[in-house]
From Swiss-Prot:
Protein source organism: Pseudomonas aeruginosa (strain ATCC 15692 / DSM 22644 / CIP 104116 / JCM 14847 / LMG 12228 / 1C / PRS 101 / PAO1)
Function of the molecule: Catalyzes the formation of the alpha-1,6-glucosidic linkages in glycogen by scission of a 1,4-alpha-linked oligosaccharide from growing alpha-1,4-glucan chains and the subsequent attachment of the oligosaccharide to the alpha-1,6 position.
Residues at the catalytic site: 412, 465
Catalysed conversion reaction: Transfers a segment of a (1->4)-alpha-D-glucan chain to a primary hydroxy group in a similar glucan chain
Gene: glgB
GO molecular function, one term: cation binding
Enzyme class: transferase
UniProt protein name: 1,4-alpha-glucan branching enzyme GlgB
């Protein structure tokens, strides 16, 4: 039978763990260690590199000097007859003196309810629980760090404040949650930090904080301590009316923006304050109701455009601080503009400092690559079936909606979440527990997300980028749907762009590409998206997709935008498309603003402003976007002339007539049936000279004739402009 260890042998063993970075329970050895049954005990501090350590009372008076156990060991200790209830340490370093409370003198930090809710996946305020929280604990100012790493042997917080030495601040493990915590006294705002984790297989790369509220400016990858948002909001009027403004009967016209490449200042990307000064007035001038920002969550690689984020709770430092971003959102609201953020719960990048293999195991991702790795994007896939990951993503969504007052989230790559075999060959995916291809865990998450958002942030939008025929994407969960407020109409986008790209002489053979979308236009609450994805990677800009010579390209573009704005569905247009940029979008540059010196480009911009004005002002164009009663075909079968015409309706409002001529041939005396006799006003002619068009086609006021056509008792005889749209409504 072996002899019991002596006290010196015991602390030598513990010291060895500290020196080797294997101390998983530092509070059992460091700080005040009370003698059994007494008031005295040993006080220990591990401070490698320190020369002297003095023990001070809470008023700063010296009580004793701690002795270094062995020269150069870094372990300072002293047995005291009475352990002080409060004390500080004065540490003499080779380059100066530091005075602070002892991190290992404080009790547990997180409450059991916080840990329970986190483990359950239902902690709605996770951003104020885990991560780095500036706080006052037991009367002392400092930062409380907390991170989930259940399979780590040891976790330390490292930063400039401890020379990035993982031996200095090992953390306390909280069982059974797997959360590690530590309060670092006197630490303040703006400190860079990461976590050093010891896994079962050895030391891991330094990890950024998954719940950091702020981050270092890339290419730096550290997290940054950040106070809770202090912004004084002035958007109460906007929030009070948001549910009405964003209802299905309201106009929704979205300007999609990549913040870093909209407009540069002195050759650099803009600051949030500069965007507030320039972007907001621009959006108001053009009449858009909302700005949709491509992901602003911190992301290491700018070339991902934000779609491979790692800081799910931190606005990117590229454009300013969290306070600056909040001020931008507030300014949008005060200007009557909503803000939607793109948000990515489907996958995350493999950067070493990120979430992948966070504690040496597949923590945030699935273990098996057939489930946990996306080969198209070289990214990990979130394991949303794990309650802690489910709760982490849910808390991220709520953080942006509640903390930053954003008005909606556009959920990226939903199709990749719904199907286990998405973009995989046979034999490269694992079925669900029923043997099917549906990702049941992701579906459960989307149900929960949409229900919680509807309950906790009324009126907020959750929009799905979903490219398959999954039924009921925008149907309520209670009715068997996924619960999104809207769905991008990817089918309409692909078909309409394919059609408009055809030579006008050949469009008669592709007539169905514009009529087909109306067969399912009311099956979901759709948004018609012309997004960034359509103007990159060799797809050409929207203007350059158009066939023909220069005049025809501009006419086609004006026609296409007019067709889009008169078609059922809410609207989304990517920046640069509104004035006909020739080049594809370049995320490293800025839009080609100089083009607005040319009348054709200015004409396109003026047309978009006119379309948005009509769209907002005329209920017929927006009130029944998702209802079949809001739409009536007049001409869908004139394949020979490539002409389409329809009526848009709203209860108690005049109907609106839209007529589109997709050939460069002017159609003189074209008869179209209308439901109402009398005079009709031409509200918009896309070929008007005001839009740098030729000025052809009907303008002003036209009178009906008592000659039935297209199932209507009355009709109008119109001159259709070449490659043009007419929008009309009854006069008066």
């Amino acid at each position: 039978m072996s002899e019991p260890m002596s006290e010196r042998e015991r602390w030598q063993l513990e010291l060895d763990k500290l020196q080797r970075g294997l101390q998983g329970d530092p509070f059992a050895f460091l700080g005040p260690q009370r003698d059994p049954g007494g008031e005295g005990g040993v006080l220990r501090a591990y401070l490698p590199g320190a020369q002297r350590v003095e023990l001070l009372d809470e008023d700063g008076a010296t009580l004793a000097e701690l002795e270094q156990s062995d020269p150069g060991s870094g372990l300072f200790q002293r047995h005291l007859e009475r352990l002080p209830p409060r004390y500080r340490l004065r540490v003499h370093w080779p380059d100066g003196v530091q005075e602070s409370e002892d991190p290992y003198a404080f009790g547990p930090l997180l409450g059991e309810l916080d840990l329970y809710l986190f483990a359950e996946g239902n902690h709605r305020q996770l951003a104020s629980c885990l991560g780095a929280q500036l706080t006052r604990h037991e009367g002392v100012e400092g930062v409380r760090f907390a991170v989930w790493a259940p399979n780590a042997v040891r976790v330390s917080v490292v930063g400039d404040f401890n020379g990035w030495d993982g031996r200095r601040h090992p953390m306390r493990r909280r069982y059974p949650s797997g959360v590690w915590e530590l309060f670092v006294p006197r630490l303040g705002e703006g400190e860079l930090y990461k976590y050093e984790l010891q896994g079962h297989d050895g030391l891991l790369p330094l990890k950024a904080d998954p719940l950091a509220l702020a981050c270092e400016t890339p290419p730096g990858t550290a997290s940054k301590t950040c106070a809770a948002l202090r912004h004084e909001w002035r958007d109460q009027d906007w929030l009070a009316r948001r549910a009405e403004r964003q209802g299905y009967a309201a106009p929704l016209s979205i300007y999609e923006v990549h913040a870093g490449s909209w407009r540069h200042r002195d050759g650099r990307p803009p600051h949030w304050s500069e965007l507030a000064e320039e972007l907001i007035p621009y959006v108001r001038q053009l009449g858009f109701t909302h700005i949709e920002l491509m992901p602003v969550m911190e992301h290491p690689f700018g070339g991902s455009w934000g779609y491979q984020p790692l800081g799910l709770f931190a606005p990117t430092a590229r454009y300013g601080t969290p306070e600056d971003f909040a001020a931008f959102v507030d300014a949008c609201h005060q200007a009557g503009i909503g803000v939607i953020l793109d948000w990515v719960p489907a996958h995350f990048p493999t950067d070493a400092h990120g979430l992948g293999r966070f504690d040496g195991t597949a923590l945030y991702e699935y273990e098996h690559p057939f489930e946990g790795f996306h080969q198209d994007w070289d990214t990990y896939i979130y394991n949303l079936g794990r309650s802690e990951v489910h709760g982490f993503m849910l808390a991220s969504a709520l953080h942006w909606l509640r903390t930053y007052h954003v008005d909606g989230l556009r959920v990226d790559a939903v199709a990749s979440m719904l199907y286990r075999d998405y973009s995989r060959k046979e034999g490269e995916w694992l079925p669900n527990r029923h043997g099917g291809r549906e990702n049941l865990e992701a579906i459960d998450f989307l149900h929960h997300l949409n229900q919680v958002v509807a309950s906790e942030t009324p009126g907020a939008l959750v929009i799905a980028e979903e490219s398959t025929a999954w039924p009921g994407v925008s149907r309520p969960v209670a009715e068997g749907g996924l619960g999104f407020s809207h769905k991008w109409n990817m089918g309409w986008m692909h078909d309409s762009l394919a059609y408009i790209g055809e030579d006008p002489l050949h469009r008669r053979y592709h007539h169905h590409q514009l009529t087909f979308g109306l067969l399912y236009a009311f099956s979901e609450h759709f948004i018609l998206p012309i997004s960034h994805d359509e103007v990159v990677h060799g797809k050409h800009s929207l203007l350059d997709k158009m066939p023909g010579d220069r005049w025809q390209k501009f006419a086609n573009l004006r026609l296409y935008l007019s067709f889009m704005w008169s078609h059922p569905g809410k609207k989304l247009l990517f920046m640069g498309c509104e004035f006909g940029q020739w080049r594809e979008w370049n995320h490293d540059g800025e839009l080609d603003w100089y083009l607005l010196r040319y009348p054709e480009h200015q004409g396109v911009q003026d047309l978009v402003a006119a379309l948005n004005r009509l769209y907002r002002e005329l209920p017929a164009l927006h009130a029944r976007d998702g209802e079949a009663l809001g739409f009536e075909w007049l001409i869908g079968d004139d394949q020979a002339n490539s002409v389409y015409a329809w009526l848009r309706h709203a209860a108690g409002e005049p109907s609106l007539l839209a007529v589109h001529n997709f050939t460069p041939v002017p159609r003189q005396g074209y008869r179209i049936g209308v439901p109402q006799g009398g005079d009709w006003d031409v509200l918009l002619n896309s070929d008007a000279q005001a839009f740098a068009g030729s000025g052809a086609g009907s303008q002003g006021r036209v009178s009906s004739e008592s000659c039935g056509a297209h199932g209507q008792a009355q009709s109008l005889v119109l001159d259709l402009p070449p490659l043009g749209t007419l929008l009309l409504r009854p006069a008066g």
